[in-house]
């Protein structure tokens, strides 16, 4: 069976189920949206989450797709960047647990990216996403070795803004014999 490698934002999902949507209003997060947040907003959310029951999961669009494929028995790998912290360790251990080949890079300067996920009573999800180390993945981080042995490269649509990295990844994948695939994550990527 052909193997597939994903390239994307290595994020940890911190999930919390809400009793009502008051907290979303308080944090100025529109229900059902995905908002990029800064460190100050992340700290504000973490303060709220410290008083709630939360659950951790690995995330990011490409990470989720690769995990799903691994669970179906496909040979998979993942390229992303995490911080040198407990979230980065969690992400790496989850890849290993699910037999996903680990091509994670580690930032010593930035913490791991976190998608604070608020689940409303009606099941709607709202994300406050701090990219952290995930956003520091650059073209020069990628090596030919990362792409060898894979038939397909799955590129997360949220990365299309970094044209240099995407083009370099495609060049390396092509040199390694991979085919490519891109997932456009939101209508914003289609119309911009």
Residue ranges with predicted function:
Residues 76, 85, 162-163:
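Short, structured coil/loop segments at alpha-helix boundaries
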Residues 1-77:
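Glycine-rich phosphate/adenosyl-contacting loop at the front of the ribokinase-like
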Residues 56-60, 85-90:
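Glycine-rich anion/phosphate-binding loops
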Residues 190-191:
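Acidic, Ala/Val/Gly-enriched low-complexity intrinsically disordered segments
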Residues 82-84, 158:
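Residue-level signal for short, function-critical loop segments
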């Amino acid at each position: 069976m052909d193997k597939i490698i994903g390239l994307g934002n290595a994020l940890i999902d911190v999930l919390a189920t809400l009793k009502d949507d008051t907290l979303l209003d308080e944090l100025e997060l529109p229900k059902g949206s995905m908002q990029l947040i800064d460190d100050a907003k992340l700290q504000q959310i973490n303060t709220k989450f410290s008083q709630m029951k939360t659950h951790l999961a690995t995330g990011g669009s490409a990470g989720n797709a690769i995990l799903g494929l691994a669970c179906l028995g496909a040979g998979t790998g993942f390229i992303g960047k995490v911080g040198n912290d407990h979230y980065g360790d969690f992400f790496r251990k989850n890849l290993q647990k699910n037999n996903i080949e680990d091509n994670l890079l580690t930032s010593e300067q930035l913490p791991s990216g976190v998608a604070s996920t608020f689940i409303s009573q009606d099941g709607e999800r709202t994300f406050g996403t701090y990219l952290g180390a995930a956003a520091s993945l650059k073209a020069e981080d990628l090596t030919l070795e990362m792409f060898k042995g894979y038939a397909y490269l799955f590129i997360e649509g949220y990365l299309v803004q970094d044209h240099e990295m995407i083009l370099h990844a495609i060049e390396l994948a092509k040199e390694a014999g991979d085919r490519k695939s891109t997932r456009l994550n939101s209508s914003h990527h289609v119309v911009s």
